[in-house]
Regions:
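Extended recognition patches within non-cytosolic domains
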Residues: 67-69, 83-88, 121-173
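Extracellular glycan-recognition modules
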Residues: 1-31, 65-69, 133-136
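Extracellular glycan-interaction patches encoded by glycine-rich segments
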Residues: 35, 39, 97-122
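Localized edge beta-strand/strand-to-loop motifs within extracellular or lumenal beta-rich domains
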Residues: 54-73, 130-131
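A carbohydrate-recognition surface predominantly in extracellular/luminal proteins
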Residues: 1-4, 19-24, 54-60, 122-125
Length: 173
C-alpha cells in the first residue's frame, strides 16, 4: 500500500448494477462490503487503522452458510484476525449469496466500471471458491515469530481452487 489518508482504494470488487462486493482501504481502515438484492448492505469497517506504507497480507473469508453471523465474514491482516469493527453490519441469515461466485465483472485494484484505483502493488491475488481457508493456507510467521511472510508460490498453487478460483502470481513481474 502506498497512498495513505482519505478516499477509497479498492483491492477487489465485483459489480452488477447497484449490487456489489468489495474489499478496500477507506480512510486507513479495512472495509468489506457485500450489497446484493437479497440482503441489505453488509458493511464492515475495521477499528484497526493501516497508516503505514508497507506490505500487508490480507485474507477475507465469505462463509455465507456459517451459523454464527460474525463468522460469515472474517478478515485477517498479517495473520491477525480483525474482531473489532467500527461498523459491523454482518449478514443476518445464513445462505446469502454474493457476487463473488457469479459471472459479473471482477476487478483487482479498482472498483469495477469506475475509478477509485488502488495505489499499491498486489503481489499475489487468490480467490478460493467453496472453501473457507484460514490465513495459514497462504502465509506464516518467520522463524523469529515476528513477521508474517507469504508461503511459496508452489505451495499456494497446490491449494484447491474449485471451479471459479484463481491464483495470480505477480511476484516475478
Amino acid at each position: 500500500r502506498c497512498n495513505l489518508g482519505t478516499g477509497e482504494f479498492k483491492l477487489w470488487s465485483a459489480i452488477s448494477g447497484s449490487n456489489f462486493d468489495m474489499v478496500a482501504f477507506s480512510a486507513n481502515e479495512l472495509g468489506i462490503e457485500i450489497n446484493t438484492s437479497t440482503s441489505s448492505t453488509n458493511s464492515l469497517r475495521s477499528n484497526a487503522l493501516f497508516r503505514d506504507i508497507g506490505w500487508y497480507h490480507i485474507v477475507v473469508v465469505w462463509d455465507s452458510d456459517n451459523a454464527i453471523d460474525t463468522d460469515r465474514i472474517r478478515a485477517w491482516v498479517n495473520g491477525e484476525r480483525i474482531t473489532s469493527w467500527r461498523t459491523g453490519n454482518f449478514p443476518g441469515s445464513a445462505g446469502v449469496n454474493s457476487l463473488t461466485n457469479s459471472t459479473v465483472l471482477h476487478t483487482l485494484g479498482a472498483k469495477a466500471n469506475v475509478s477509485q484505483y488502488f495505489d499499491g502493488y498486489l503481489a499475489e491475488s487468490v480467490l478460493i471458491d467453496g472453501l473457507a481457508l484460514e490465513p495459514t493456507s497462504f502465509g506464516q510467521y518467520d522463524s523469529t515469530g515476528t513477521f508474517w511472510t507469504p508461503l511459496s508460490s508452489a505451495t499456494i498453487k497446490g491449494l484447491t481452487f474449485v471451479t471459479n478460483g484463481f491464483y495470480l502470481d505477480n511476484t516475478t513481474n
